[in-house]
Structures are given as structure tokens and as C-alpha cells.
Amino acid sequence: MLENEDLAPLIDQQALAEFRNRALTPEHPVARGMAENPDTFFAHRESCNNYYANVPAVVEEYMEKISEITGRKYGLFDYYGAPDAERVIIAMGSVTEAIREVIDHLTAQGEKVGLVAVHLYRPFSAKHFLAAVPKTAKRIAVLDRTKEPGANGEPLYLDVKDCYYGQPDAPVIVGGRYGLGSNDTTPAQILAVYENLAMAEPKNQFTVGIVDDVTFTSLPQQEEIAMGGEGMFQAKFYGLGADGTVGANKNSVKIIGDNTDKHCQAYFSYDSKKSGGFTCSHLRFGDSEIRSTYLVNTPNFVACHVQAYLKMYDVTRGLQKNGTFLLNTIWEGDELAANLPNNVKRYFAENNIKVYYINATKIAQEIGLGNRTNTILQSAFFRITEVIPVDLAIEQMKKFIVKSYGKKGEDIVNKNYAAVDRGGEYKE
């Protein structure tokens, strides 16, 4: 992380002071642009052209300075992928990290694919953009995270089309939309974009992440693939709003992040009901940088903290072969076998899933924690997965208990200590 002292030499303090002195303030009132005739307004509006024209060079200069400090290359447009890529995606924002994951997967198989990540969108520098795109590119897909009904395309798509206007041997360019309303964008969807570019006539103005059965803009969904490489552990926790599952998982991430060299990531999804509603926690731990900017869809471990979810949601979806499943349930033995849905039992058998179950609800009531099963199930998670040494996990959990509940009295702390200790009462 850069400190202020690292960045201070890059800033022209005098220019910054002059800028602040021009700020509107009631202590030094000034009127600007109150009234202007048409002949001068138009001319004044165009007078800013040179300032905008100079912005790319200025930004590039400072990006080079930042690159020197961080050791990471930053440009107005950054290319990633095969040097002789024929199919290229143009995008900006967090989705570019997911695209990089897919590129690594495809180039390892000999595919000629790439990405141009946009860092300076306005003003859009055609010169820098064209320099970033490989000369070998034959097909380009431009991804926009917006929709402009009635237009011939979305903004970034039209900018890219304009860059190639009138050029001989220009690549085929199509546009698509993704991620509206924070809709998840997964590797399978990125794969669909590259597959679309490989078609004889790629679909233009396509969508990914939805099934559009009205106007048929959506691309066929590809099968999800596990990303992250060796050493990546992914987990999903299905819980009930206010049962403490989300809070416990936030603590788990802190425990692992603070006590190991592992990279950690946590996403949390909720429905609109909050308390009493559906929650799902998505955790990742890895030995290398985590570039997955989407919810976990191929977990190694799944915990279902509400047994009713077995018949309400597809809780085993994406669980990897030889993965682990933990169920909080009141059922045992033959009753458990009788109540598990057939599709769940079939998935367990076909994918060699290790299944554990625990009656955390009963344990919580015996301890005096009511319906707060979170600490019990968090303890079970650490014991089953051994993602970090169990003794270390238990020690750190108890430290977090003191930090979280210490002000509520020794009785509450001791009850949560008991919950940690009884987290080992699961059965296989």
C-alpha cells in the first residue's frame, strides 16, 4: 500500500494551492457564467479543447511515475494475453480480472486470445488504444456495463468502432452488455464471449449472465470451470439472516488473513428480507493473488446451516469432485438418509463428496445461545477443512469472542467458548 509520503513528490503543491484558491467559497464570493450571449458562449465552450487533448499525455506521464514506485506497469490501455491474439475483448473495471483468469486458462490450451483493459476512458485516446491492440487481432468484442436503449450501441463499443472507421483490414467488432444491476459475471460468461468471436458470424449487441427468451440477445451459457489454480480453496456458506453466519465468516477471513500468508477474499449475498432471509457467504483462500471478481461457483466446501434449504435451493451446485459438505440438521442416521432429497444424494455419490452433519441448533440451545449457531458451525468448518491448524483456529476464535462479546459479560464469553469446543461434535 502506498503511503502519503510516496505520493507527495508527484504532486505540484503550488498548482494544487492555486486550484484550491479558485474554489467557490462564501468567504470570497465570486460570480461565474451568470449570463453569456450565444456568440461568445459557443466559442468559450470550445476553448477547453486543448486542455482535454493534453490529458492523455499528462495521465500517461503520471502513470509511468506510479509504475516506478510500485513496480507494476500502468498505462492508458493495458494489453494482456497472447502476443499474437486473434480474438480480443475490450473492457474496463473489475471484470478485467476475471477475463485475465479465462485468458490464462485458454492460452494454456494454445488459444490466441487477449484483453485490452481501459484505464483512461475520457478523453478516449485513439492513438494509445490502437497501439495496445495486437496487429493480429481479427475479432474484437467490446463489453459495456450499461444499456442505452435506442442507440446503435453502448458508449465504449461506439468509441472502438470509431477508432477503426475507414481503416483497411479493420477487425470484426461486436458489442455486448454484462453486469447490469451488479449481476455476476463469471468465467463461463467470458468463455461464451470468446466462443462467440470464433463463430463465422459473431452475434452483435449480445448479453451475458441472463437468459433473454424475449429478444434473444443472450449468448449460450458455458459450463463453469474452477479457476485460481493450485492452492485455491473456495467455500460457500448458506445461512439465515441474523443467525450470525455472515459475521462468523468475516471473522474467519480475518483469522486466516492475519495468521497466514494466504490471500483472502470474501463476498456476501443477501435477499431483501435481511433478518430471517437468505444469506450466502463466499470465501476464497489462496497462496497466490486472487483475481476472481465474482461469487464462488465451484466451491471445494459447502456448509448448509439451514436444513430446509436442501429442498429450496440447489445447495450442491458447482461443488467440486471430492469436495466437502457440512449440514446443520436435526436428522440423524436413517432419518437423515430418508429426508435428503434424491438429487442431493445422487450428487454426493457421483462426485465422491465427503458429507458431515451436526445438530448445531440443539447444541446452541443447550449452551444457552438460542438460535445463534454461527460459532459452533465456524468451529466445525475449521476442524473439518484444516485450512489452518485447528489449534491456531480455536485460539484465534476465542480471541475474537473476547473482542466481540467481552463487554457483555463473562457468562456470554464462556457460552461462546463452549460453542467453539462443541464444534467438534459433527458426524460423518
Language model: regions and residue ranges:
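Conformationally flexible catalytic loops at phosphate/diphosphate-handling active centers
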Residues: 1-78
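Thiamine diphosphate
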Residues: 60-209, 282-284, 299-301, 324-354, ...
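Flexible inter-domain linker/hinge segments
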Residues: 50, 181-234, 413-428
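Active-site cofactor/cluster-binding pocket
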Residues: 123-124, 139, 143-154, 229-241, ...
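Active-site-proximal beta-alpha loop/turn segments in soluble metabolic enzymes
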Residues: 40, 44-47, 176, 402-405
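A glycine- and small-aliphatic-rich helix-loop capping segment at beta-alpha/alpha-beta transitions
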Residues: 2-5, 159-163, 251-260
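Short secondary-structure transition/capping segments
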Residues: 29-39, 160-172, 217-225, 310-321, ...
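Non-catalytic terminal/interface segments that mediate subunit docking, oligomerization
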Residues: 55-121, 214-299
